[in-house]
């Protein structure tokens, strides 16, 4: 049976045959290196889900197939870009690549392992792992050698090992984590405790949250950022657990994780609002702003059980804040600075996925299921309206044309965007959280 026939069969009965033409056209651009990944994802799209989600998953499979290119530079394996529709052209890496690995690990574990190796292959002697990797006229990779990015890649490495049992791969990952920790400790530590991103001093957007509201008013000196602290805790925690798995000393990593966890719980938590904030605003009520980054201690497991439940119930599931018709809003609806621009309000599916992972971590499968189902429903509706996968979405199901990105020639969200849309992973976690029986 050829692929187009398989797609027609999968679309039968879901009232979406008209979208089959879109999927078929997308298939025309699939690369030689991307075809096996696309085929595996088409197969995954046949797993139990809501029928209304299947057309967008099949389209997403084609986008993955169009985004894999031959090995070049320090990439020893074919590499996957962040999507064919990104306005900046072909780009590799950043947090987008982690989301793509979440999306493809069940369909093609080998592809995920190779993308991790490609990413770690660019690690500098000082420990920095390149963030946004661009390509010059000859197709060779280049990046800024002073700017990092959130080190969430470790979670995708662990997911790969869980999927395959390839524990030996952790040797490569642990070596990279040790060096990356060294870079963060040398370059991004705050006197007195915690870590920060370079966004604190300039518009570098090292955090990946371009033009986020937290940096509208900056402190006079480096201070602990809630997201950076959470992400470095993630490094310490993984370094400790991987060391144990490989029968190597773990005590130092455990001690560092424990100390940073206590710092986050005590110094970045506000008991009045039941939310986490940056160090320079947490004790200043007039400066506190409800931005989604306050969920990160829950996502990484640094919050106490009580703190996590408050974040989930009072904020993530609050329809006046983050639980919008398309969740999650990146800035609470109740926040005066909420607007339909970039990370200042719109919904990004990748962050809904991270929020759901945090809910599951603290035993709230019910909350994860609600977040994921609502986001996938909304994404499917928008796919039916516009026939594409968007970089980010209107949190209240309004027209995408109302959204703004940055004041450039293309001040709208990118179309055909992979990096922030781990829809296969979201559907899988939804199943695990009780959405449908897992088969």
Predicted segments, located by residue:
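Bacterial N-terminal signal peptides that target proteins for export
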Residues: 2-12
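Bacterial N-terminal signal peptides
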Residues: 12-21
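Boundary at the C-terminal end of the N-terminal hydrophobic targeting segment
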Residues: 24-26
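Extended, well-ordered alpha-helical scaffold segments
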Residues: 33, 37, 48, 52-60, ...
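Extended glycan-interaction surfaces of carbohydrate-active proteins
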Residues: 40-91, 114-144, 189-223, 262-347, ...
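Alpha-helical support elements that line or immediately flank enzyme active sites
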Residues: 90-123, 293-305, 352-365, 372-375
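Substrate-binding cleft of carbohydrate-active enzyme catalytic domains
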Residues: 92-121, 143-191, 221-238
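Short glycine/serine- and small hydrophobic-enriched flexible loop segments
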Residues: 102-105, 155-162, 234-244, 299, ...
């Amino acid at each position: 049976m050829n692929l187009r026939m398989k797609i027609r069969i999968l679309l039968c009965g879901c009232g979406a045959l008209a979208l089959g033409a879109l999927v078929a056209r997308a298939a025309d651009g699939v690369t030689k290196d991307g075809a096996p990944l696309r085929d595996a994802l088409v197969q995954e799209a046949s797993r139990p889900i809501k029928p209304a989600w299947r057309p967008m998953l099949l389209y997403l499979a084609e986008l993955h197939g169009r985004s894999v290119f031959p090995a070049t530079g320090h990439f020893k394996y074919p590499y996957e870009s962040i999507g064919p529709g990104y306005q900046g052209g072909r780009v590799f890496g950043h947090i987008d690549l982690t989301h793509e690995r979440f999306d493809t690990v069940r369909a093609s574990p080998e592809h995920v392992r190779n993308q991790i190796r490609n990413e770690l292959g660019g690690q500098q002697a000082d420990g920095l792992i390149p963030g946004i990797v661009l390509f010059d006229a000859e197709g060779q990779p280049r990046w800024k050698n002073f700017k990092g990015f959130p080190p969430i890649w470790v979670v995708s490495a662990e997911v790969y090992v869980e999927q395959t049992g390839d524990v030996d791969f952790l040797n490569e990952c642990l070596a990279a984590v040790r060096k990356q920790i060294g870079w963060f400790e040398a370059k991004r530590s705050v006197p007195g405790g915690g870590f920060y991103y370079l966004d604190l001093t300039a518009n570098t957007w090292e955090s990946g949250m371009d033009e986020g509201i937290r940096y509208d008013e900056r402190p006079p000196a480096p201070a602990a950022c809630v997201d950076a602290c959470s992400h470095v805790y993630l490094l310490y925690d993984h370094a400790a657990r991987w060391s144990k798995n490989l029968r190597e000393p773990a005590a130092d990593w455990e001690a560092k994780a424990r100390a940073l966890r206590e710092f986050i719980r005590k110094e970045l938590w506000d008991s009045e609002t039941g939310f986490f904030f940056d160090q320079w605003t947490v004790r200043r009520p007039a400066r506190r702003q409800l931005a989604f980054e306050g969920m990160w201690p829950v996502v990484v497991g640094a919050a106490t059980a009580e703190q996590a439940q408050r974040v989930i119930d009072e904020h993530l599931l609050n329809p006046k804040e983050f639980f919008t018709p398309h969740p999650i809003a990146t800035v609470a609806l109740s926040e005066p600075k909420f607007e339909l621009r970039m990370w200042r309000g719109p919904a990004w599916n990748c962050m809904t996925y991270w929020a759901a992972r945090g809910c599951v971590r603290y035993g709230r499968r019910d909350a994860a299921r609600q977040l994921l189902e609502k986001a996938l429903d909304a994404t499917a509706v928008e796919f039916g309206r516009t026939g594409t996968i968007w970089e980010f979405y209107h949190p209240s199901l309004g027209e995408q044309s109302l959204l703004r990105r940055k004041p450039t020639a293309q001040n709208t969200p990118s179309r055909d965007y992979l990096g922030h849309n781990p829809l296969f992973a979201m559907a899988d976690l939804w199943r695990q959280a009780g959405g449908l029986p897992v088969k």
